[in-house]
Amino acid sequence: MNINSTLIGQAIAFAIFVMFCMKFVWPPLIGAINDRQRKIAEGLNAAEKAKADLATAERDVQQELDLAKTKAAALIEQANKSANQLVEDAKSQAQVEGERIRQQAQAAIDQEINQARESLRAQVAELAVLGAEKILQDKVDVQKHASMLDQLAAKL
C-alpha cells in the first residue's frame, strides 16, 4: 500500500474529527451517562430506603394492632366485670328489698293479728258483761265494769 497525500489528508481529518469529538461531543455524552448513573443510584437508594421504611411501618402497624387488641380485651374484661357487678348489686338490692317487703308484710300481719285479738277481747268482755247482766239482772257500775274488763282482757 502506498502512502500518498490522500491517506495523510484522511489521517489529519480523522485526527481533527477525534479532537473535535473529544472536545465537544464526548463531555456531554459522559455527563449524560454520569447523570443517568447518579439518577439510577439515587433511585436504587430511594427504593432501599422505602423498603426499609415500609418494613418499619409494617412493624409499627403490627405493634399498634397488638396494643389495640390488648386495650380492647382489657375494655371488654372491664365491661364484663362491670356488668357482673351490676348484676350482683341488683341481686343484693332485690334481696334487701324483698326482705324489707317481707318484714313490712309480717309487721302488717302482726298488727292485724293484734287488732283482731283486741277486737275479740272486747267482744268477749262485752259478751261476758251482757251474760253477767242477764244472770244478775242488775246493772254493774261502769267503773267496776271497766276494771273487770281490763283484768279479763289481761288474762286473755
Swiss-Prot record:
Role played: F(1)F(0) ATP synthase produces ATP from ADP in the presence of a proton or sodium gradient. F-type ATPases consist of two structural domains, F(1) containing the extramembraneous catalytic core and F(0) containing the membrane proton channel, linked together by a central stalk and a peripheral stalk. During catalysis, ATP synthesis in the catalytic domain of F(1) is coupled via a rotary mechanism of the central stalk subunits to proton translocation.
GO MF entries: proton-transporting ATP synthase activity, rotational mechanism; proton-transporting ATPase activity, rotational mechanism
Organism: Psychrobacter arcticus (strain DSM 17307 / VKM B-2377 / 273-4)
Entry's localization field: Cell inner membrane
Membrane topology: Single-pass membrane protein
Protein name per the record: ATP synthase subunit b
Keywords assigned by UniProt, alphabetized: ATP synthesis, Cell inner membrane, Cell membrane, CF(0), Hydrogen ion transport, Ion transport, Membrane, Transmembrane, Transmembrane helix, Transport
Transmembrane feature ranges: 11-31
Subunit structure: F-type ATPases have 2 components, F(1) - the catalytic core - and F(0) - the membrane proton channel. F(1) has five subunits: alpha(3), beta(3), gamma(1), delta(1), epsilon(1). F(0) has three main subunits: a(1), b(2) and c(10-14). The alpha and beta chains form an alternating ring which encloses part of the gamma chain. F(1) is attached to F(0) by a central stalk formed by the gamma and epsilon chains, while a peripheral stalk is formed by the delta and b chains.
Family: Belongs to the ATPase B chain family.
A Pfam family reported for this protein in Swiss-Prot or TrEMBL: ATP-synt_B
